[in-house]
Amino acid sequence: EHGPNFVKTMARLAGERDTVSVVSDQIGQPTWTVDLSRYIAEVLGAEVPFGTYHGTSEGETTWFGFAQAVFEELGLAPDRVRPISTDEFPQPAPRPAYSVLGHNRTDAVGVARLPHWRVRLAETVADVVRDTR
């Protein structure tokens, strides 16, 4: 049901390691494709002015905070997740430190916002746990 994703990776690493190191200085909005798909369909189906609309979940967090939330949802100690800086985790492409997008245009045209990322996280973790049994 869910392809490869951060939640599955954290769940797998939780079973393999005592601690997991995750970047703590990049802030974003975890967003699920099921929510984004609904949002895109709603925007395309509505008579809204041409322009840019940000389809991201409510709320913001760091990758570190997201990983801690995954551990919490799994019933594991979130202090098993250790914060590291972007400099300590080399990636092939640079990532922005702050990639939170506003929803002003969405609100202005009456399109429903995406749910808070923690709502979908709880559902996803339940699915991941069910699928691994």
Where are these regions (language model features)?
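Residue-level signal for the nucleotide or nucleotide-sugar donor/cofactor binding architecture
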Residues: E1, G28-T31, T61, L101, ...
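NAD(P)-dependent short-chain dehydrogenase/reductase
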Residues: E1-G28, V34-D35
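Short, surface-exposed alpha-helical segments at coil->helix boundaries
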Residues: P4-K8, F64, Q68, V100
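Hydrophobic "lid"/C-terminal helical patch
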Residues: M10, I40-L44, A67-V70, H103, ...
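Non-catalytic, hydrophobic alpha-helical segments
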Residues: L36, I40, G55, F66, ...
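Mid/C-terminal beta-alpha module of Rossmann-like enzyme folds, strongest
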Residues: Y39, A46-A93, R133
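C-terminal amphipathic/interface module of NAD(P)-dependent oxidoreductases
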Residues: P94-R133
